[in-house]
Amino acid sequence: MKNNLFFQSISNSLHPIFNSEKFLQIMSSLSEIILLILIFSWILKKISSFKINKIISRMKIIERLSVGSQESIILVEVKQLRLLLGVTKKNISHLHTFPSNSKDELIKETNDTLLQKNLFDRSLKNFSKTSWKKTMFYRIIPFVFLLSLCPSAHADMPGLTSHILDDGSQTWSVPVQTLVFLTSLTFLPAFLLMMTSFTRIVIVFGLLRNALGTPYAPPNQILLGLALFLTFFIMSPTFEKIYKDAYVPFSQEKMNMEDAILKGSMPLKKFMLNQIRTPDLELFSKLAHISSYKNKNDIPMRILLPSFITSELKTAFQIGFTIFIPFLIIDLVVASVLMALGMMMVPPSTISLPFKLMLFVLVDGWQLLITSLAHSFNT
């Protein structure tokens, strides 16, 4: 039943296109476009085939022979004479003069072989040029008659359509919505960095790697992937609320795009407000010359976003400080032991690295760190 309705809708939509008059107009317009393309290509070919008259030169280099990195012997023809010249980096010396009557056998044989090789290519080029000139006239004649006999067709650009919803609001058509969606994808990295828990997590992971003394393990790709999936895990309640409150009504055409964006921003605002420190919010409010707010939901994004970022940076550095303390103690102990033993030339990081890794594994560091990060967010 669904297939029959689908094919019936397709036939109904295509029936106006294949109407006799409209179909003739479409075909005539298509023929005009093809004719313009052919004429334009022919004009370009003619323009590109124009050759600039070269300056007549009485001197011609016949052959060149390199005898070193910067030395060569050149055979030059000047009027009726052929000169053999020796060319170096500093000077040019005359070696011998050949009269024009004495033909160089080597050059003649070379020219003969080149003429034999290029004979077939030249014939093909001549054939293509003549065939183009002969057939181009016969190609243009039918299109001239077609243009003179066919009626003119005009194509109108489809306008940007909109739909009226049940509540009286207005929504744009699907192509416009698709364009807006694809444009919004360019802001996805900024959204991920400035409005989620990704900033705090990735900074803590980077500080952990520096505290361990392993700048290349784990690699950046592993840390970014772990931070990304942990961000989705922490933000999943917020994303689910955005999906239910904003996306589902918008997909069912119960809400327009503007209301959906406002409705979807409310859970993100609530998440960011729970992480923002009061001094940071007061600082940016003071810089924006805003004294007070009636409600937390009235705080604009231009104040909320920088306050959230600065709060996240401060929290991430505090967590990183607590991570550095045990590893710093290990470095100090190892350095003191090496100094006491007189091993001045041994770098302490080489000795302390195994102890740091052993400590991190014994306390189950990854589980402890991820658990602490997940509980550090006030959701």
From Swiss-Prot:
Membrane-topology descriptor: Multi-pass membrane protein
Subcellular location: Cell membrane; Bacterial flagellum basal body
Alphabetized UniProt keyword annotations: Bacterial flagellum, Bacterial flagellum biogenesis, Bacterial flagellum protein export, Cell membrane, Membrane, Protein transport, Transmembrane, Transmembrane helix, Transport
InterPro entries: Flagellar_biosynth_FliO, FliP, T3SS_IM_P
Main location: membrane
GO cellular component: bacterial-type flagellum basal body; plasma membrane
Pfam family, one: FliO
Ranges annotated as spanning the membrane: 23-43, 140-160, 178-198, 222-242, 319-339, 357-377
GO biological process: bacterial-type flagellum organization; protein secretion
Tagged with keyword Transmembrane helix: yes
Role summary: Plays a role in the flagellum-specific transport system.
Protein family per UniProt: Belongs to the FliP/MopC/SpaP family.
Annotated protein name in UniProt: Flagellar biosynthetic protein FliP
Gene: fliP
